[in-house]
């Protein structure tokens, strides 16, 4: 019997993924990662629901404590980034370094198993011509999570199964109901786990970063107002600035060194290109010449035509066919060829 370790958060997606594999004849081992320190309500409730699911399916359930790893790679990563004036994207970092990597390692070393599965909405295929595993969008485009998975290595993709990749979300809930899963009607998480457990990103950051008042200025240096910390702002932000102006103003720069928030009109926050670092080439090997693709600079942004120009040291330059609004340092840029994820990386700060 084929053995697979299924990552269980206690939600309907991971529960259904486990149930599907169980009914397909896999020997399923449920695995829940204990992520957050303190009274992280989402984790404790998720652990209970995951344990209940495994009892219902008659499969073993294990909990692995990786709170220190989560603290280092996610909490500290976020706090350091925001304090430096960038807006980090924790999800892709978490998937690679906290979830998939440790899950595969634990499965291989502790459970003698070389396959894992999760409830993510994405697909994986193998290209025999290139010898590479390809990451593809999910069938349900509205639930597609490939943007957050671009940083998975070939080794991790080879070890992973996405049972929900071919399903619509409505199908997932229908299957969960048919299997009689207790999580079938469980509401979806609406935000980052850290945000849900703290109430807001601002509340989370306030636990680690003290208020630090400074000036909100325009591009000439004129003081327009005050702020209580650059970490409370993000590029492209318009609301919540607390300043009056004849025309709409947006955050165009976060000058953490001088503790200033710089604002300007919409043209000042629209860019024709950007540089991306920590690039991971997924479905294709790194090209030696520029390629044309479609890029997403945010999770829900519309894919836009782009020229991807390879640079040294795992970096690329993205030149957009049309200038893009609110390109945010710290967020991921992920480029596609149709449904295929070609590569992605982290947007650098503008010099």
Swiss-Prot record:
Top EC class, one word: transferase
Pfam family, one: tRNA_Me_trans_M
EC number(s) stated in the UniProt entry for this protein: 2.8.1.13
Gene Ontology CC: cytoplasm
Site (Interaction with tRNA): 120, 331
Subcellular location: Cytoplasm
Active site per database record: 94 (nucleophile), 193 (cysteine persulfide intermediate)
Record keywords, A-Z: ATP-binding, Cytoplasm, Disulfide bond, Nucleotide-binding, RNA-binding, Transferase, tRNA processing, tRNA-binding
GO terms for biological process, alphabetical: tRNA wobble position uridine thiolation
One annotated GO molecular function: ATP binding
Residue ranges that the Swiss-Prot or TrEMBL entry lists as coiled coil: none
Matching SUPFAM superfamilies: Adenine nucleotide alpha hydrolases-like
Disulfide bonds, paired cysteine numbers: 94-193
Catalytic activity line of the entry: S-sulfanyl-L-cysteinyl-[protein] + uridine(34) in tRNA + AH2 + ATP = 2-thiouridine(34) in tRNA + L-cysteinyl-[protein] + A + AMP + diphosphate + H(+)
Highest taxon above the source species: Bacteria
Annotated segments matching region Interaction with tRNA: 143-145, 298-299
InterPro entries xrefs: MnmA-like, MnmA-like_C, MnmA-like_central, MnmA-like_central_sf, Rossmann-like_a/b/a_fold
Binding-site residues, ATP: 7-14, 33, 119
Protein family (similarity comment): Belongs to the MnmA/TRMU family.
Role description: Catalyzes the 2-thiolation of uridine at the wobble position (U34) of tRNA, leading to the formation of s(2)U34.
Protein name in the entry: tRNA-specific 2-thiouridylase MnmA
Organism of provenance: Nostoc punctiforme (strain ATCC 29133 / PCC 73102)
Phylogenetic classification of the source organism: Bacteria, Bacillati, Cyanobacteriota, Cyanophyceae, Nostocales
